[in-house]
Amino acid sequence: AYALRMQDYNTDTALRTPLPGLTDANFDYNTTYLGVGTEGSLGADWLYLGEVVASLGETQSDPVRTIQQEDDVEAYAGRAQITYLFRDRNQTRAQGEALFATGDKDRLSSTDTVNGNLAGTLDRAFNSLGFANTGLAFSPSFSNLWTLRAGVSTFPMPDSVWFQQLQVGADFLVFNKMEAAGGFDETTSNDMFLGSELDLYANWRITSDFAVNLRYGVFFPGTAIAGPDDARHFVLIGCTLSF
């Protein structure tokens, strides 16, 4: 269990993009995060993990639609993951994960003050400070979102001198909005289905102090995405040298 206080000391009031009749705003956002989690094993082959977080505090309302005022924040997020260990020479494992973060139906943006919470209403949009696996190519903010992920990884050549430490894996993710009419990272319709994604990766420790990492993700937009429906691609090639 944990508690974390986020106190906003930012005094900047200027809008990044001034709007007609509006050049500044109050961006105060002060919340307390209360979380509880658990992890462990179920027998020899199953691992589990779970976490639930509540975000409680105060925010400033959207300055565009009405005069700003202070509103309450009450938002939630959670994660559940289960892993099956095959116990083979390839160290193969399969994973399933579900994530959710609440959204707010009167927000136009899931995280910003501008186009944010409507004055006089409870802000239910979760504002994440941690990491959640929301894909390589899509990778939206963890707010007004629920996802399902299935993945598998293995070391395919355990007897090879050169490729003994090569791990390969794949994840398939499905993305949906929690609030169909709520704001999101990008322009969306009132549909809930954001899309799906396939991520492939390889981690190869060539020597004790040098490793290569490859990542590729492709996101297929769903019916909720208002922009172009072309597939989005992400490629990463990284090298790590340890001293």
Describe the predicted segments one by one.
Residues T66-I67, G182, A226:
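Short glycine/threonine-rich loop-to-helix capping motif typified by GTGT followed
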Residues A231-F243:
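Outer-membrane beta-barrel "beta-signal"
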